[in-house]
């Protein structure tokens, strides 16, 4: 997945990306790419790994928002798992808490439950209490759920919706 968000608070939209693969230069990892001063002439954008080898199981889409109210942008991610996941470590939803230095790896918080086909995960204030909750879908599976901030209690939105992918 790819997403744009201002991760470092400099007013520019950065790119967040994950490969979802267990091999390569950054296995089971996800990163954000810092916008260079002159993007048109830049040969490379600076890469910062926020999920360092702790996003196994064919991770998919990303979301971003300040989930704990500390003023820093946290990142959400899902891993679909399934037959193609040779690690057997997928089928989860999680969020990564940004520290004071967003160029360093973030702290992972795995959300409750096992979720075959986990794909989309977006912060949203579902219950109107002013705190960002998390809405998530099992796009390669069945169902739509939300997690209630701050204890992350899971609530079903629809448990028979097939492949709610995008």
What are these language model-derived features?
Residues 1-166:
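Beta-propeller-forming repeat regions
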């Amino acid at each position: 997945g790819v997403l744009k968000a201002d991760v470092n608070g400099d007013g520019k939209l950065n790119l967040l990306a994950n490969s979802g693969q267990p091999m390569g230069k950054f296995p089971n990892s996800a990163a954000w790419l810092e916008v260079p001063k002159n993007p048109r002439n830049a040969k490379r954008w600076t890469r910062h790994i926020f999920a360092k080898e702790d996003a196994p199981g064919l991770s998919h889409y990303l979301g971003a928002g300040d989930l704990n109210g500390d003023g820093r942008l946290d990142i959400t991610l899902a891993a679909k798992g399934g037959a193609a996941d040779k690690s057997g470590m997928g089928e989860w939803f999680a969020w990564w808490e940004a520290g004071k230095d967003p160029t360093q790896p973030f702290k992972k918080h795995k959300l409750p439950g096992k979720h075959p086909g986990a794909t989309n995960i977006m912060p949203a204030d579902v219950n109107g209490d002013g705190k960002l909750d998390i809405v998530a879908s099992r796009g390669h599976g069945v169902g739509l759920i939300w997690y209630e901030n701050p204890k992350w209690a899971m609530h079903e939105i629809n448990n028979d919706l097939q492949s709610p992918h995008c």
